[in-house]
């Protein structure tokens, strides 16, 4: 999959397989 690490100040991650661990997207196990 794609690496996570985008910021998610809106609470949303646009990278598939990532979830928001404010303020950075983290990979969903």
Curated annotation (Swiss-Prot):
Explain the post-translational modification.
Answer: This is a cyclic peptide.
Q: Which UniProt keywords apply?
A: Disulfide bond, Knottin, Plant defense
Which Pfam families is this protein grouped with?
Answer: Cyclotide (PF03784)
Sites of the Cyclopeptide (Gly-Asn) crosslink: 1-29
Q: Which InterPro entries match?
A: Cyclotide (IPR005535), Cyclotide_moebius_CS (IPR012324), Cyclotide_sf (IPR036146)
Question: PROSITE patterns under this entry?
Answer: CYCLOTIDE, CYCLOTIDE_MOEBIUS
Which GO terms are recorded in the biological process aspect for this UniProt protein?
defense response
Report the record's disulfide bonds: 4-18, 8-20, 13-25
Please verify whether the record's keywords include Hydrolase: no
Q: What does this protein do?
A: Probably participates in a plant defense mechanism.
Q: What is known of its domains?
A: The presence of a 'disulfide through disulfide knot' structurally defines this protein as a knottin.
Q: Which family does it belong to?
A: Belongs to the cyclotide family. Moebius subfamily.
User: Can you say what this protein is called?
Assistant: Cycloviolacin-O16
Q: Can you name the source organism?
A: Viola odorata (Sweet violet)
């Amino acid at each position: 999959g794609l690496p996570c690490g985008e910021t998610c100040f809106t609470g949303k991650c646009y990278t598939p397989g990532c979830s928001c661990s404010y303020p950075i997207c983290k990979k969903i196990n």
